[in-house]
Amino acid sequence: MESTPETSSTDAISDSIRAILDRQKKAHIDEGPASVKRRKDWIDRSIALLVDNKDEIVDALTSDFGNRAPVASLMTDVMGSVGPLDHAKKHMEKWMRPEKRKLQFPLGLLGAKAHVEYQALGTIGIISPWNFPFNLTFAPLAGVFAAGNRAMIKPSEFTPACSELMAKMFREAYDETEVAVITGGPAVGEAFSKQPFDHLLFTGAGSIAKHVMRAASENLVPVTLELGGKSPVIVSRDSDIEDVAARVMTGKTLNAGQICLAPDYVMVPEEKADEFVAGAQKIVTKMFPTMKDNPDYTSIINDRHYDRITGYIEDAKAKGGDVIEINPANEDFSQQPYNKIPPTIIKNPTEDMKVLQDEIFGPVLPMKTYKDVSETLDYVNSKDRPLGLYYFGQDSEEERRVLDNTTSGGVTVNDVIMHVSMEDLPFGGVGPSGMGSYHGIDGFRTFSHAKAVYHQSKAKMVAEMFRPPYDDKKRKRVLSMIKK
């Protein structure tokens, strides 16, 4: 099913999606558990799709964004998808093995046994976003396929060229009972969220996640929500500020900051503020001597998001903010074919500024200063728990203090974003930044049912322990086990 006409009635849209889901569920039952060979074949087909269509993927991303660095697209959406799939293929047999579990005394001595089996759930729904449309579809499939599941995918309507290509790719490589792509706008997304999947993965904005979770709850569908938030950067006094600025701005300008894990704001020692700005200007100039017509500098996805981000800058200016635009060639961005916004630092923003209230999701970086690191912890803990937190410093005690006294989905020390690329680490949020996780073995387990299996001892005395009559001997045995 490539598309669902938006003009169709809500019931008709839902029915057409449900028909595909029913066929997938029937195939899952009729064909029985997927063998290791079949799971690896599913993964191999996805890897082949990415490799064989890499040029088309880059072209589709460029078309949807208006301008997106081809090498960056290859790194994030192709290489960044092949890696998780290959990792799952190499390790799935180990993940699939039953896990022995311990038994209470004396059952183990009497021959009882217990283990956990990881069983495929069935059909996993995947709602993927526009910022990395291929990566955030294919990377979850690593865990989905490794666990022996089928998938139904709803890509974002904000990237129509990518969605169309994705539908074509999957249609050519998979039967619809294995993988199906459902394209369309909000009405399709709403109908998709209401389906009785065996698990639903949503990546996107928290405001939309509330609707998705509410819809899924009607069928008690478990959800994994990968959201975002305002991921802070805490810079220690003993840091190499120029290097810190370079790493932060590299992360902030990747995809023009349109990353759920992008550093949202930075907190630096007050005496290091000017040095950080100078370092940021230096690295941006090195990376992007020009920006307006530079294919390496990514556009903002659409007019709405462009207006939203420029609105943050204008709001900061109107409220007296010290706004520093990093524009090495002094280009005029008021007249341009693409929605590009130069990297912008807002020094010492005030709490009434929108840039400190909303997730930025763009190349704007508020910079707060502090006297003591305790101020940074208080500030982070006064906000919603973020998807990522970044600490720069060499003081192991201070690092431990930051990690112990803040809560975030994940942490990268002495860089930004990088923890998401470690396949053996879980990726997920906490609280408003998300729930659940995937990647590597954690993805395999998220998309599996951990089934407890117990084999009873053949010893008759085990069964006799629980049967009436409850004489004094049995009473004493029970009481002997109730102790501090």
Describe the role of every protein-language-model region.
Residues 39, 85, 148, 179, ...:
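Residue-level signal for inorganic ion chemistry
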Residues 1-113:
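N-terminal Rossmann-like NAD(P)+-binding subdomain of aldehyde/semialdehyde dehydrogenases
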Residues 11, 174, 207-350, 413, ...:
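ALDH superfamily catalytic-core signature
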Residues 104-243, 281, 370:
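Rossmann-like NAD(P) dinucleotide-binding subdomain of oxidoreductase/dehydrogenase enzymes
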Residues 17, 36, 54, 241, ...:
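Residues at or immediately preceding the N-termini of alpha-helices
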Residues 2-7, 11, 26, 34-40, ...:
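Conserved C-terminal structural/oligomerization subdomain of aldehyde/semialdehyde dehydrogenase
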Residues 28, 47-50, 54, 89-96, ...:
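Structural signal for hydrophobic packing residues in well-ordered secondary-structure cores
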